[in-house]
Amino acid sequence: MQMQLNAKTVQGAFKAQRPRSVRGNVAVRAVAAPPKLVTKRSEEIFKEAQELLPGGVNSPVRAFRSVGGGPIVFDRVKGAYCWDVDGNKYIDYVGSWGPAICGHGNDEVNNALKAQIDKGTSFGAPCELENVLAKMVIDRVPSVEMVRFVSSGTEACLSVLRLMRAYTGREKVLKFTGCYHGHADSFLVKAGSGVITLGLPDSPGVPKSTAAATLTATYNNLDSVRELFAANKGEIAGVILEPVVGNSGFIVPTKEFLQGLREICTAEGAVLCFDEVMTGFRIAKGCAQEHFGITPDLTTMGKVIGGGMPVGAYGGKKEIMKMVAPAGPMYQAGTLSGNPMAMTAGIKTLEILGRPGAYEHLEKVTKRLIDGIMAAAKEHSHEITGGNISGMFGFFFCKGPVTCFEDALAADTAKFARFHRGMLEEGVYLAPSQFEAGFTSLAHSEADVDATIAAARRVFARI
């Protein structure tokens, strides 16, 4: 299904809403016009960027292709808020796509980074900070006995792909339709995130041989997994998945699904990897695997563990991790891996998250937010389904339930585009795609949430 909105759809989505009055003999309630959003400087900067950067951005979803209009160009962020170059202030539910769990520009994180700058930003050599953060990760994450730091979530995922193959001696890997594990070749087959947003089934440039080694099953459907294992007996190195999908929108697994995957992988001699780049340390102190009580063999991480700095990590059983060079034969390296700035920000972020009440706050404000948005939608007869786990949430404009990518395709993307624009006009910044999860932070207050719900109610009244 083509997910990119065409020009006609977008134009219709943003057509001025005239106040309702009496039409024929039917009285229709008048609706207040939306606030005027001035974006002149954003438009100027983006116009110049299109001559300098492919599509004017450095990551596709930022271009607002699926919601229409031009992207908002930011000037600064702090706490739960962001300000654009035109001076507009927004309550932010993107959070730099997940890392800003303590709030933007957290003072404790900033002070730690400022102190580290004077000592050095990159050594290209071991530093004790790597040990400190590694111990924190190992202490909290059930599956991790040893960890390797890298510089992005994509790097972490492509590394575990190679590791699964090296450990098992097999070539094929199984993933799930709509799950996104970065932009490595093997993961761009029926992927999520910006790949869905742009309406791309796959990406040009991926060799057919690579695509052939990537098997795709249906999320929350164990039969589809069993069928692929039966058809590829002894050939599947491992299974990788988002334990909570955040790159096809917000999709929650059943406990039976995750438990079934654990049992299948154990029986088939395949490696089970949870991609916790998004969920790691966000939905629980010990990540999604702690929340659901299912322990994978390998885990990828990112976002939160860098506290806003570029970072990634992968870890798991020592038996498997000792395959990684220089301990073993599977080669992987990185110039900025384990750099002191990322380690410093990660240490302070995990320290803050380890304090009493942190995850209770995330659950409280996020549940209040999603319940309020859905109630506001239903007040104005809009079909909606959604939910949250701790500081991660999402909703779809459809009846639901949404249990897999195929269900998500039923969502009304044109309505989401109108809603997104309306919320921007009301001073609320949501992810510019129906197919991305949203995030709250420790900096979000109940007042922020209530203001957001009130804004949603006004927008639902006029779309």
From Swiss-Prot:
Residues 1-30 form a transit peptide. Its cofactor is pyridoxal 5'-phosphate. GO terms for molecular function: glutamate-1-semialdehyde 2,1-aminomutase activity; pyridoxal phosphate binding; transaminase activity. Keywords: Chlorophyll biosynthesis, Chloroplast, Isomerase, Plastid, Porphyrin biosynthesis, Pyridoxal phosphate, Transit peptide. It catalyses: (S)-4-amino-5-oxopentanoate = 5-aminolevulinate. It comes from the Eukaryota. Belongs to the class-III pyridoxal-phosphate-dependent aminotransferase family. HemL subfamily. This is Glutamate-1-semialdehyde 2,1-aminomutase, chloroplastic. It comes from Chlamydomonas reinhardtii.
